[in-house]
Amino acid sequence: MGVDTESARPSMLVLARESRAMTQADVAEAMTKALDGEGVVSQGYVSKAESGRLAVFGDRLALYAQALRYTPHLLCFDGDAEGAGVGLIHHRKKASLATTSLRTVHAQLNLVRLQLRNLLQAVEVRPAVLFERIEVDDRETAEDAAQTLRARWDLPPGPIESVVGAIESAGGLVIRRPLAGRELDAVSQWPEGENPIFIVNALAPADRQRFTLSHELGHVAMHVVPNGLQEQQADQFAAEFLLPARDIESDLRTHIDLDRLYELKKVWRVSMATLLRRAQTLGAVSGWRHRQLTIELSTLGYRTAEPQTFPPEKPALIPALIRHLQQERQLAVADLACLAGLHEDEFIDFFLAEAGTP
């Protein structure tokens, strides 16, 4: 079906605009600029298009897509384009993150979900989902949930070699890309009947990415309905998932100082600050000692930038699916970009650049 017969879905017009952090006035201005003096598009037109009060097709669809820097096909995507009904969106963010920035990231996540859905349909074999919902209550704690998931996924005792690898082996789809500067660590979603999706901020340090992914994993496993304790529970889940009490206690028995935390960081592949918090939680250091070492970390500038002892973990599942489409289905990058509703250069940047896939 070509541009002449396709018609944009109003919800996709909103989603595409928000993913670009544009206002309706911005879209109208971009469309007017693209007309190169041959007409003017008003903000009112964009508002009517987004509300479904007028149809967008043909040349006007192509113009709209040009302004939003997507393909016309993306604006016609079928399916749920908004968060309602497709699964609770979780995110790990700083309080300073603006609401508009969060809306942009949520829109980007929903677009990624639709793009991956199209790519997975082309593969024809969706990765098996080994995730499960684990209800946390007075009897089942977040730590219990982490132990349950480690056992279900057959993760050996001790440090997890790759959090990304563990999630992907269970059918989770992981993407690394810059998100809202350093104000947002990750965003995740587990839509009903689909694979869980995790987008982690590529700008974050490697140690923080591992904890963040584990935190998001806790969310998708435990939190179908939001609650006031969910951030605390996700942190507790992540701590036990990455640093199981029964496995790390022996490492915390010796005198804890910055040198010891640095050595343990190499083994457990989490930040020194995370190890220090875990040591206090498990009673290996007192509250006074925790405060003292926190001050030392801050004095050295480690609260914002610790020495990195290992590289970031790179996702492999999505690049492997794309390679399958290239090799087995003989699809060129241009074909894949079309499925995702992206121009070729942006498709490469979003899905292939980090993996080095041609």
How should each PLM-predicted stretch be described?
Residues 1-358:
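Active-site hotspot residues in diverse enzymes, especially metal/ion-binding acidic/histidine motifs
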